[in-house]
Amino acid sequence: MSAREEKHQRGSKRPAARREEEAGCGSWEQADLGNEERKQKFLRLMGAGKKEHTGRLVIGDHKSTSHFRSGAEDQKISDELEHQYQQSMDSSLSGRNRRHCGLGFSESETAEEKAPPPPPEHPPKTESESESSSEVSSEEEEEEESDSDSASDDDTAHKRKPTEQSDKDIPDSKDPKSNYKMLFVKSTGS
């Protein structure tokens, strides 16, 4: 072909024969799939099958919907649904199903529950020391019990979380994760 013919072909439309071939790609009815049963199954799976109507459908003709509810029944059903909704919200917010909270879920209660107990105030004693000071230790325990009964809730919370003391040492940061990381770094460093 000459350059003139190529230029003419580039600007011209495609011949009609190609259009017919391309249109054949979407017509599944003409595909040879074997017997009629396989063809119908293929068309149904592809969503191109003709749907057969089994009869006339009348809205509200079903037996279960043929009766009308009274206002009292509607109110009772809506109250029951609201009650069920409130129960599910309360149970999900109470933390009963914590496994559904997702990654990174943290709550102040979980930190208190999993926190290790504080170390004993007195160093462990040997057997000879413990026998001689058994009377003294029982008096000390009684004093500690009376002190703990009179102590406020803030003091007990303070004993449970020794890391809260260092919150004052850390510069103010509004991100609680940042504070936690800094506390962890400070506690491991010293």
From Swiss-Prot:
Residues 84-95 have a biased composition (Polar residues). Residues 129-154 have a biased composition (Acidic residues). Residues 49-83, 162-178 have a biased composition (Basic and acidic residues). Residues 1-190 are annotated as: Disordered. Belongs to the SMAP family. This is Small acidic protein. It comes from Xenopus tropicalis (Western clawed frog). The gene is smap.
